[in-house]
From Swiss-Prot:
It is found in: Cytoplasm. The keyword Endoplasmic reticulum does not apply. Activates KDO (a required 8-carbon sugar) for incorporation into bacterial lipopolysaccharide in Gram-negative bacteria. The gene is kdsB. Its EC number is 2.7.7.38. InterPro entries: Cytidylyl_trans, KdsB, Nucleotide-diphossugar_trans. Belongs to the KdsB family. This is 3-deoxy-manno-octulosonate cytidylyltransferase. Pathway: Nucleotide-sugar biosynthesis; CMP-3-deoxy-D-manno-octulosonate biosynthesis; CMP-3-deoxy-D-manno-octulosonate from 3-deoxy-D-manno-octulosonate and CTP: step 1/1; Bacterial outer membrane biogenesis; lipopolysaccharide biosynthesis. GO terms for biological process: CMP-keto-3-deoxy-D-manno-octulosonic acid biosynthetic process; lipopolysaccharide biosynthetic process.
Length: 248
């Protein structure tokens, strides 16, 4: 099947300035992400950035760049600019791979594209089982609950679903009902065009989760369990050192 990968790579970061260019064992982080995307079999891979230094690093590695504005409020808005500049048809399958995921498995990039292509829906994503209480109660681990057909009912930083009887006895263990949302998305280009014209929803402001805008406006998001769980993403200096060690 044919699909396009777009990798948003914003230069500014509160915790890690210049994050896309941080060195991981001799290569900029964004180049590692580009290489994982190439392994997925994508027809085309575009790095969307707002900084010339990132563009130069990607082009030096043989990658394609689309320069975007620096004032986007989300990665999806940056994708929308690329969709318009490249003139993708509405039915083009686009996978959004985060620029700070140098250890993302290529197999799940393709998985989310295939899941979207097989369904009459505008958006798809992935999740992974949660087995430990620490992750289940961590607000930085976004939880998702699904309906019988694998479509998202809700995403939250809260512990959902709340296992009333189990948690009344102890908060030390969790069952097999929890799923952690993974930050990889597949979209049809036409859906991205519609999404950016919707006003932000109250729920996404409360949870700080932009995918809640989709549910707010009555659209569906298909969620599959990932074939392989991604390694550590890079949000902090500690994450960076961990990734450097794991990728040696």
């Amino acid at each position: 099947m044919s699909f396009v990968v777009i990798i948003p790579a914003r230069f500014s970061s509160t915790r890690l300035p210049g994050k896309p260019l941080l060195d991981i064992n001799g290569k900029p982080m964004i180049v590692h992400v580009l290489e994982r995307a190439r392994e997925s079999g994508a027809e085309r891979i575009i790095v969307a950035t707002d900084h010339e230094d990132v563009a130069r690093a990607v082009e030096a590695a043989g990658g394609e760049v689309c320069m975007t504005r620096a004032d986007h409020q989300s990665g999806t808005e940056r994708l929308a600019e690329v969709v318009e500049k490249c003139g993708f048809s509405d039915d083009t399958v686009i996978v959004n791979v985060q620029g700070d995921e140098p250890m993302i498995p290529a197999v799940i990039i393709r998985q989310v594209a295939e899941n979207l292509a097989q369904r009459q829906v505008g958006m798809a994503t992935l999740a992974a089982p949660i087995h430990g209480a620490e992750e289940a109660f961590n607000p930085n681990a976004v939880k998702v609950v699904l309906d019988a057909e694998g479509y998202a009912l809700y995403f939250s930083r809260a512990t959902i679903p709340w296992d009333r009887d189990r948690f009344a006895k102890s908060l030390e263990t969790v069952g097999d009902t929890f799923l952690r949302h993974l930050g990889i998305y597949g979209y049809r280009a036409g859906f991205i065009r519609r999404y950016v014209n919707w006003q932000p929803s109250p729920l996404e402001h409360i949870e700080m989760l932009e995918q809640l805008r989709v549910l707010w406006y009555g659209e569906k998001i298909h969620v599959a369990v990932a074939k392989e769980v991604p390694g550590t993403g890079v949000d902090t200096a500690e994450d960076l050192e961990r990734v450097r060690a794991e990728m040696r």
